[in-house]
A protein has these predicted regions:
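Exposed beta-sheet edge/beta-hairpin loop segments within beta-rich domains
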Residues: 101-103, 160-165
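Beta-sandwich interaction modules
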Residues: 112, 157-161
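Conserved aromatic beta-strand anchor motif in extracellular beta-sandwich/beta-rich domains
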Residues: 130-136
Length: 200
């Protein structure tokens, strides 16, 4: 019967769902793995079609876990930032200079957890405070105060869900009133901080 008549490109907004084949999706190759961060999806944003990277939709990142590998000395009676010089992982390369900085596009609710352990040189002390700072202030609710027994090398842990905006910073601090300058028990399971984004 000859070639099908070429009517050109349809006008914008004239192709409706009724004109699409029912296998437009099911007939294509299925993606059987978790999408890559740069994979793109099409969605309707209040009626306007937009393209979005998968990285902006998934929870669970950024995430990080860092720890202290070299012992740090902590002065008496002053809040001191804890050195976290080694990484187990840092999915978005967002941890640097002992600080986690929320990447652009990754604002949301984060679970932040931290632990600090004293070494065995400490005398008994009433205040061994572990604090998570947001933007230079301890306003996150992530604060715990623990007593330390002499020569026992115990410590304290703290965890909180914190609402963070892009470019917000998270740091780990310690305060004690032992009376002198004392050391931390460095190590992967002794002095560490971790965080993970759990949602918007």
């Amino acid at each position: 019967l000859g070639n099908v008549l070429d009517l050109g490109t349809p006008s914008d907004g004239t192709v409706t769902n009724a004109k699409l084949a029912q296998d437009i999706i099911s007939g294509e190759t299925a993606l059987t793995d978790i999408p890559a961060d740069t994979d793109e999806l099409l969605l309707s944003d209040a009626g306007t079609l937009k393209r979005i990277d998968y990285s902006l939709m998934r929870a669970g990142t950024p995430s990080f876990r860092v720890y202290q590998s070299s012992a740090q000395s902590i002065s008496n009676g002053t809040s001191t930032q804890v050195t976290l010089d080694s990484e187990d992982w840092d999915t978005d390369s967002a941890f640097a200079s002992n600080t986690f900085t929320v990447p652009a596009g990754k604002a949301g609710k984060y679970i932040i957890t931290a632990c600090i352990r004293a070494d065995a040189s400490w005398a008994e002390t009433e205040q061994f405070n572990v604090m998570i700072y947001r933007n230079g202030a301890v306003d996150t609710g992530a604060f715990v105060s623990n007593g330390i027994n002499a020569s026992h090398g115990n410590g304290a842990c703290v965890s909180a869900v914190i609402d963070l905006a892009a470019a917000d910073t998270i740091k780990l601090y310690i305060y004690h009133d032992e009376g002198g300058t004392e050391g931390l028990e460095a190590g992967q399971g002794n002095v560490f901080m971790s965080g993970i984004r759990i949602g918007a």
